[in-house]
Amino acid sequence: MAMDFAKGITEFRWHGRGGQGVVTSNQMLGKAALAEGNYIQAFPEFGPERTGAPVRAFLRISKKPIQVYAQVYHPDVVVCIDPTLVEVVNVAEGLKDDGTLVINTDKGPEAIREKFGVKGGKVVTVDASTIAMEVMGRPFYNMPTMAAAVKATGIVAVETVTNEVLERYPGKVGDLNKVAIERAVKEAKVG
């Protein structure tokens, strides 16, 4: 089901750890939205982060020019790339009541809904860790998790985001990411 652009701006907040590709996946989704004729703002939260430290990135997508220049405090969509972060950070904080929570986990949507007390909206889970290890042989969770967010929101076509990934990563790396994206779209659970 596609996100409702009638309300104006769709806001994303991404969570992960430094070095996991939080900023990259945020940019890839933003570039895909731009390719489909939308306006975007994509920006990371910088601080003293280092590899392994919790990081966040933000994305706004709109059919009209965006004139908001602040951090995203009440996102429509929260995407968590690192499955261990849900134990130390309330990634659902500020999520709108009708929002979408997308998490890389081997748990089902109901378990995540209960853990974070999400009453309305949508909870989407995908085992991006397993997908990444089986497809790429490395812990690159960001693209499969992003694919689950695309499936959950319909904000852009899966083909558009896949094309952006292939453009950024030509050759074998891009091909493996494409397989991981396709698998995540099939395996993501919406509840």
Regions found by a protein language model. Give the residues of each.
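Active-site cofactor/cluster-binding pocket
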Residues: 1-191
